[in-house]
Design a protein with these regions (language model features):
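Auxiliary Fe-S-binding modules of radical SAM enzymes
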Residues: 1-39, 70, 104-115, 130, ...
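N-terminal pre-triad scaffold of radical SAM enzymes
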Residues: 18-57, 72-78, 82-85
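Short acidic, gly/pro-rich beta-turn/loop elements at beta-sheet edges
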Residues: 36, 50-52, 96, 130, ...
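Short connector loops/turns at beta-strand edges and beta->alpha or beta->beta junctions
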Residues: 45-48, 81, 148-150, 215-217
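Core AdoMet radical
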Residues: 56-71, 78-129, 135-168, 181-185, ...
């Protein structure tokens, strides 16, 4: 794994790529990169939102790199990635929310990597259906949009996002024939029943894949961890989710 990790790191630096693995200070970077998988972040390294859990810099986004779609596609090719995950910062400063750039990136990846399956982890595009349509048109295998937390904590955790808007986005994508996925962070002060309710809400929006993980504080400035959720509780969540999905 270490050799592959070093090789990937060199490639990312040489191509000046933004991976959320690095900028988000993900603790599992060695494991994923060692296995030859990575998540690419497009649209720059500065986010227009300031979610309390995330280590990505906040500010006015920089100019889009028109060569980025090609660079990402080329890197996936060089790395031999079989399943690529692409995400982006929120670009509320752009008229189209970055959706054109997103579509170009997916098209470019397809062109250079016809056998690679694609997962796009998208922002909410402020619920703008025209922007969501651009993602639908390029038809990634999976479209992810993370709800992140339960409704009660949503305002505190993801300040400029809205719980109901995220559900709307997921339902809109599902109704358009997309395979949708969402993620929840646990250990932020939510109750078990609130997680169950969120799973029910996601299911009602047509979501077919949900990931649940432990929230980890990336720096002391970020939202504190309320609790480390016991593996048995995660098992309860898994079983509940599987029952909901029947």
């Amino acid at each position: 794994g270490d050799g592959k990790y070093s090789e990937m790191l060199k490639l990312v630096k040489e191509n000046k790529l933004h991976t959320i693995c690095e900028s988000g200070k993900c603790p599992n970077i060695g494991e994923c990169w060692g296995a030859g998988t990575a998540t690419f972040m497009i649209g720059g390294n500065t986010c227009t939102r300031s979610c309390q859990f995330c280590n990505v810099a906040t500010g006015k986004g920089e100019a889009l790199d028109s060569l980025e779609p090609f660079k990402v596609a080329q890197s996936i090719n060089i790395m031999g990635v079989k399943h690529a995950v692409v995400t982006s910062v929120d670009r509320d400063d752009l008229e189209d929310g970055g959706s054109e750039h997103w579509a170009k990136t997916v098209e470019s990846i397809r062109e250079f990597n016809p056998t690679t399956t694609l997962e796009t982890l998208i922002p909410d595009f402020q619920g703008n259906t025209k922007q969501l349509d651009r993602i639908i048109e390029v038809h990634p295998e999976i479209v992810s949009h993370n709800i992140e937390t339960v409704e009660r904590l949503s305002k505190e955790v993801r300040i400029q996002a809205k719980y109901q808007r995220s559900l709307f986005v997921l339902k809109y994508l599902t109704d358009a024939g997309m395979k949708t996925k969402s993620g929840i962070m646990c250990g932020m002060g939510e109750t078990k029943e609130e997680i169950y309710q969120t799973l029910r809400d996601l299911r009602a929006s047509g979501v077919s894949i949900v990931t649940l993980g432990q929230y980890m504080q990336s720096t002391p400035r970020h939202l504190a961890v309320s609790e480390y959720v016991h593996p048995d509780t995660f098992l309860d969540y898994k079983n509940y989710g599987l029952d909901e999905g029947k």
